[in-house]
């Protein structure tokens, strides 16, 4: 209904306040959404609020609650966000006080594996989806976070040998290789 749309638009506008430090519990969420599609959108907004608040468990629970929603966009975006949420959980635990990467020893393996599984599931279901390119790049980050330099080197070789990227993007990729991979693993040097 038009009332549902208005309520959901308002709720979406409230979401940016999370980035300004507002707590999820302080947001006035609509309470009278009348249809299942609208409820799925509301749950997506709430899950995203938890994601941006770094409440990984609640975000995961909420995204999974709507992963089979009737709306095709909700199904696709939640499939992607389940992986992104697990990646952020893993990444944040490995950051130091000043945002520096503390190293592979600080990586939690379970969310890393769950993120990998979620992104691969997303890509098998939506190989040309709206978030396919991002999911592919985030899988590359997961390979790096796992410490698999040989796997990362194979992925970089695959990317450099494809026509997926324009030349300008390959320059950025070469810089990434310099930062993440060098020195080369002994088996590849």
List each language-model region with its residue ranges.
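Acidic, polar-rich low-complexity tracts and alpha-helical solenoid repeat scaffolds
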Residues: 1-189
């Amino acid at each position: 209904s038009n009332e549902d749309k208005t309520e959901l638009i308002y709720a979406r506008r409230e979401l940016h306040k999370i980035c300004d430090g507002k707590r999820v519990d302080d947001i006035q969420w609509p309470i009278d959404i009348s249809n299942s599609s609208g409820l799925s959108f509301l749950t997506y907004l709430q899950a995203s609020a938890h994601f941006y608040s770094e409440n990984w468990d609640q975000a995961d629970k909420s995204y999974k609650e709507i992963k089979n929603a009737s709306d095709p966009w909700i199904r696709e975006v939640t499939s992607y966000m389940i992986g992104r949420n697990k990646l952020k959980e893993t990444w944040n635990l490995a950051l130091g006080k000043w945002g520096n990467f503390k190293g592979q020893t600080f990586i939690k393996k379970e969310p890393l594996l769950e993120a990998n599984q979620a992104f691969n599931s997303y890509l098998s279901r939506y190989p040309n989806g709206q978030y396919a390119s991002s999911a592919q790049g985030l899988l590359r980050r997961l390979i790096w976070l796992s410490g698999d330099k040989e796997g990362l080197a194979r992925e970089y070789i695959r990317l450099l040998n494809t026509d997926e990227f324009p030349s300008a993007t390959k320059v950025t990729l070469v810089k990434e290789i310099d930062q993440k991979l060098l020195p080369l693993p002994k088996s590849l040097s």
